[in-house]
């Protein structure tokens, strides 16, 4: 079965997206999630079906979540955050003098 879905991006976290049924808008998304997500920014609408492939999400999981809870939250890909948080002097230790 096909579903028309609206996809919103988070202003708080890069590459975090919220999928909702277009007909429901954001009505079924828990208020606590919206607080953590930030004010949703509409990215685009998409027709989803089991035959459609998504780049980073399992289409069956997305459709199941849309049916059961009314939304699907796509988390950002894992990063090597530890490198970004090291002090500058540690990052430069191996630089040539």
Swiss-Prot record:
It holds the Pfam family YcgL. Residues 3-87 form the YcgL domain. This is YcgL domain-containing protein PSPTO_3921. The lineage of its organism: Bacteria, Pseudomonadati, Pseudomonadota, Gammaproteobacteria, Pseudomonadales.
């Amino acid at each position: 079965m096909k579903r028309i879905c609206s996809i919103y991006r988070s202003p708080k976290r890069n590459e975090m997206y919220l999928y909702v049924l277009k007909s429901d808008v954001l009505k079924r998304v828990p208020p606590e999630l919206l607080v953590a997500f930030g004010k949703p920014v509409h990215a685009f609408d998409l027709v989803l079906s089991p035959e459609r492939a998504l780049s980073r999400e399992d289409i069956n999981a997305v459709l199941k979540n849309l049916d059961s809870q009314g939304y699907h939250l796509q988390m950002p890909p894992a990063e090597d955050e530890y490198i970004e948080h090291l002090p500058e002097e540690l990052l430069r230790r191996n630089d040539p003098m």
